[in-house]
UniProtKB/Swiss-Prot annotation:
Modified residues annotated as 3-methylthioaspartic acid in this record: D89
PROSITE patterns for the chain: RIBOSOMAL_S12
MF annotations from Gene Ontology: rRNA binding; structural constituent of ribosome; tRNA binding
GO BP annotations, alphabetical order: translation
InterPro entries for the chain: NA-bd_OB-fold, Ribosomal_uS12, Ribosomal_uS12_bac
Annotated function: With S4 and S5 plays an important role in translational accuracy.
Gene: rpsL
Presence of keyword Ribosomal protein: yes
Biased composition (Basic residues): 113-123
Region (Disordered): 1-28, 104-123
HAMAP family: Ribosomal_uS12_B (MF_00403_B)
Family statement drawn from the similarity comment of this UniProt entry: Belongs to the universal ribosomal protein uS12 family.
Protein name according to UniProt: Small ribosomal subunit protein uS12
GO CC list: small ribosomal subunit
């Protein structure tokens, strides 16, 4: 416990909050170009082939982003929009690709939760 004199001499320092998505540079989304599209396997109790892409952002960072939904049309040089949000069972994947914008098409035949996958309302 500091004395009043110690507090006068040097005030209490604020605790700095560390961002979980530094590559976005305080923006809600960032545009980028896919440099590599591939599949990877998740951490231990889970088993799958998760679709991910290595993306070079306009902020200068190169990050790994998850491609949500079933099926995608992304390949090298595709222009995509990135949002924050990690994938719990993929270490190092801290970003999501937004479906239905730029070169990433929406998920086909999606009926529920369409807004998250960029799918238009079926007629």
């Amino acid at each position: 416990m500091p004395t009043i004199q110690q507090l006068i001499r040097t005030e209490r320092s604020k605790v700095q909050k560390k961002t979980k998505s530094p590559a976005l540079k305080q923006c809600p989304q960032r545009r980028g170009v896919c440099t590599r599209v591939y599949t990877t396997t998740p951490k231990k109790p889970n088993s799958a082939l998760r679709k991910v892409a290595r993306v070079r952002l306009t902020s200068g960072f190169e990050v790994t982003a998850y491609i949500p939904g079933i099926g995608h049309n992304l390949q090298e040089h595709s222009v995509v929009l990135i949002r924050g949000g990690r994938v719990k069972d993929l270490p190092g994947v801290r970003y999501h690709i937004i479906r239905g914008t730029l070169d990433a098409t929406g998920v086909k035949d999606r009926k529920q939760g369409r807004s998250k996958y960029g799918t238009k309302r079926p007629k």
